[in-house]
Amino acid sequence: MSELSTYKGYSPKHGDKVPVLQNLNDLTPKDFYDKFIATRTPVIIKSSLPESDWKGYLWQQQDYLLSKIGDIVCKVEPIDPVSGTFGQGMSRNEMSIKEFFQKLKNGERLYLTTQYDESNEVLDGDDEVSLLVKSLCPHPTDGLLTDFSITPALMGNLVPQQCNLWIGKSENGTSSGLHHDFHDNIYAVISGYKRFVIISPDHANQLKLSGKISKIHPNGLISYEGEDCPQRSDGLTELDAAIAKTQFLEKKIGSLKELAVPQESIELLEAEYENEMDRVLQMQIGGPEEDWNDLEEGDAASLLDGSVGGDPESDILLNEGNDIEATSLQDTKPELPDHFTKVSVNGLHKFMGFDDAKNVDVDKDELSALAGTVPLVVDLEPGDMLYLPASWFHEVTSSSASSGGSDVHIAFNYWFHPPDNLEDFDHPYLDRNIWQAKRHLVGEAIDQLYATNKKNEKRPAEDDSPSQKKTCQ
């Protein structure tokens, strides 16, 4: 393991297989946390989540799905006719979900994902709750809110980051390319089939990543050099964390004023608040501290308008839809995001001995990059779910049941902020004050989402009042 790595989670040995949960009955969220989340161990879930949390199986019926979201207009991406890939600069076209399904039926090669949706852009006057409402469930996922819980009981006290929908069609299989993500993930297959090849984060340094690693945290989260604000082990940038701290202090000051506590105590917190605001402004805008002395209490939320750069997962589909074709390390395009490897789909499949790459020549450097790793293979069918901890590398091959008719592959993602206090189910994040503020804001956003969509949803628990959901079914 590299000196850059402090990873303490599960690392497979030869002969290991991904564990399978056949039944969630009698399994508590704490059981799941202790066995899998805390140990950073992927697990296949064969048992359905309780009806109160998950009715995604209804989306297997296309008529039902279209009745829910058919009229919603989204951006859909065509395959690049030159490279045969998705996500490499092709213009995305707006169309209704009904029109998208019809084009798939007619044989057009298109892909829909909400993971890098830009239609919910930041508008002047948006506060953080408004931004969270837009980002937690991008269109058309918000049209399906009556069918799933943003905070499923199984995930205990983890804070949700986003929910995503993926729809495509391919008889022979399309590939995501080998990459990692920055959040814990529950991947649910609605229709079609998915084959995952997964590799633990402790092999990151040998996988020819596009970016240069600065650190692999104990929970496996990978940070990169050259970022304006390097990621912390909980997935936040320093700017994110500083803003959250100002929000926590702002809320606490307001509460103390209502309680009429001594002014001296309030003044100490106000001084801390002002210092934190200065840090935020210097990271966000730059310039001398004295330029910002006129800011009033309550300005913290406004700092978020456009303050945070692109989501590191926003280019997740860079190679989605890639037909198998030889690509050497030297041929890899420089615009690959940091978290993608330069190992081609062919190289990985050749190393794994998959039939589609048996007769394909690949660069020896690709095979040597994979030597010493212990990839695990996960085959998922409709109804299956996979828990994958943050920064586990994975290549996903998606395929439909058949090429004719209306068969499509549909998947759904839950993303959660990665825990960095792994031994504490009740408080899975080390920076409690910051995550108390984040939980409160996420809870408000969830309330707004479900109020709009006519469903009641339990908020994620505050850090000082952890989740008391005891069973998953």
UniProtKB/Swiss-Prot annotation:
Q: What does this protein do?
A: Has a role in meiosis.
One cellular component (GO) term of this entry: chromatin
Superkingdom of origin organism: Eukaryota
Task: For the region Disordered, give the residue spans.
Answer: 452-473
Give one GO term, molecular function aspect: peptidyl-lysine 3-dioxygenase activity
| The keyword Membrane belongs to this UniProt entry's keyword annotation | no
Q: What region holds the JmjC domain?
A: 140-433
> Which keywords has UniProt assigned to this entry?
Meiosis, Nucleus
Q: GO biological process annotations for this chain's record?
A: chromatin remodeling; meiotic cell cycle
Mention any Pfam family matching this sequence: Cupin_8
Q: Where in the cell is it found?
A: Nucleus
**Which Gene3D superfamilies does the protein's record reference?**
Cupin (2.60.120.650)
Which named protein is this?
Answer: JmjC domain-containing protein 4
